[in-house]
Amino acid sequence: MKNAREIWRNVLSVIEEEERTPKASFDMWLKSTEGISLMGTTLVVSAPASFIVTWLERQYLSLLQDTVEEITNNKLEIHFIEESQAHKYAPADGSSNESIAVTETKEQPVLLPSKEEGDLGQLNDKYIFETFVIGSGNRFAHAASLAVAEAPARAYNPLFIYGGVGLGKTHLMHAIGHYVKGQKPGARIAYVSSEKFTNEFINSIRDNKTGEFRNRYRNIDVLLIDDIQFLAGKEQTQEEFFHTFNALHNDQKQIVISSDRPPKEIPTLEDRLRSRFEWGLITDITPPDLETRIAILRKKATAEGLDISNEVMLYIANQIDTNIRELEGALTRVVAYAKLVGRPIDPDVAAEALHNIMPVQEAKKIVIRDIQEVVGQHFNIQVEELNSKKRTKTLAFPRQIAMYLSREMTESSLPKIGEEFGGRDHTTVIHAHEKISTLLKNDVEMQETIQTLKKALSN
């Protein structure tokens, strides 16, 4: 028999002792949490503030649920709450909730909101037009989304929004759904990811319920389908979505689609689907500029009731310049760090909080062409000569060096390297690599040459 507090203490102990997350992260996000109660198959856990609750749900939920299952041999849902709300969930004196055996199989009703996305009509309450920060990179996408929401199936149908991860595509889709619901409370809205659409379709085939599946998705007013690029390669699902699209479009129902790339760049997407995606309006969202990033941080701080100086916001905005989710996450981390170390939020605290999560600039990926150009410049020969069939000593030796570097500094296969050097056989590449490797053991001049070339390639 274990109660919620004991279970949660065990969970934290395992995570800390086995270093399943860095110590700094554990101290910042997990150490201050506490198990409050067991409600059926739901474990209620408190955290000191709402932004910590949000961070735990986004970053740690999977790890925590796996650890809970490992300890209890039960699949328990974790529901995070603010510490100030803990009294609402704490069991009354003598309540069995406080000492439920974790192997309890009897289901008990738990009045908690569902977190599952994809249910027809279910939308995220935070994703509305009023909370969307408009900037140069998303202004047109926002205007198009608002136009669609104001006049479904009359403005742009379909509306296709594309852009990188965390830039606001999903926010706009949910905002459209909320706006339509506000104007027409009886409207049937479906928000679904392409992955969930695929899974439901597969399940309907397995259970002989394809008719029910089709009725569900073809009798709605607005279809919001996220990450359509994941339909690539799924021929049967594409076939089903093609007919769903046609049915809705013919009935003058609104379709909104999001993707990480435009239709023409989605591989193995059927041409008939690609052409339909291009029937309406295609708009993109690009990473926010500095002013927009600061505005996003300011709006989040206001929503959370946080007093953050412009100096700190500027610092954070300068560190994260591509992804809105990471930007908001950075603010959350700074606030949590300041709270836990008991210091005011200033640029120094922000720098300390973010020092180990700043994106490290990836080294440029070296390709064979880079090596050919650098070697050619070093030996004063043209790349075309390096790749020619000529076997003069002035060409053969630099060519062998270039092949050696291609083998050492790229992930290309031997046949690929040979192909890039004038269609030579892979055995030629092996010979070149062995020859240069042998010379490097004792030839100081060769060692210096290779070092110089590697340095040039790295720069």
Swiss-Prot record:
CDD domains linked to this entry: AAA, Bac_DnaA_C
Region of interest called Domain I, interacts with DnaA modulators, as start-end residue ranges on this chain: 1-83
Region annotated Domain IV, binds dsDNA, chain positions: 339-459
Entry's localization field: Cytoplasm
Xref: SMART domains: AAA, Bac_DnaA_C
Entry-linked Pfam families: Bac_DnaA, Bac_DnaA_C, DnaA_N
SUPFAM superfamilies according to UniProt: P-loop containing nucleoside triphosphate hydrolases, TrpR-like
GO molecular function: ATP binding; ATP hydrolysis activity; DNA replication origin binding; lipid binding
BP GO terms, sorted: DNA replication initiation; regulation of DNA replication
Region Domain II: start-end pairs: 83-121
Positions with a binding annotation for ATP: G166, G168, K169, T170
Domain III, AAA+ region: annotated segments: 122-338
Keywords: ATP-binding, Cytoplasm, DNA replication, DNA-binding, Lipid-binding, Nucleotide-binding
GO CC annotation, single: cytoplasm
Record's subunit section: Oligomerizes as a right-handed, spiral filament on DNA at oriC.
Domains (record comment): Domain I is involved in oligomerization and binding regulators, domain II is flexibile and of varying length in different bacteria, domain III forms the AAA+ region, while domain IV binds dsDNA.
Function: Plays an essential role in the initiation and regulation of chromosomal replication. ATP-DnaA binds to the origin of replication (oriC) to initiate formation of the DNA replication initiation complex once per cell cycle. Binds the DnaA box (a 9 base pair repeat at the origin) and separates the double-stranded (ds)DNA. Forms a right-handed helical filament on oriC DNA; dsDNA binds to the exterior of the filament while single-stranded (ss)DNA is stabiized in the filament's interior.
Family statement: Belongs to the DnaA family.
Protein name, per record: Chromosomal replication initiator protein DnaA
Protein species of origin: Exiguobacterium sp. (strain ATCC BAA-1283 / AT1b)
Source taxonomy: Bacteria, Bacillati, Bacillota, Bacilli, Bacillales
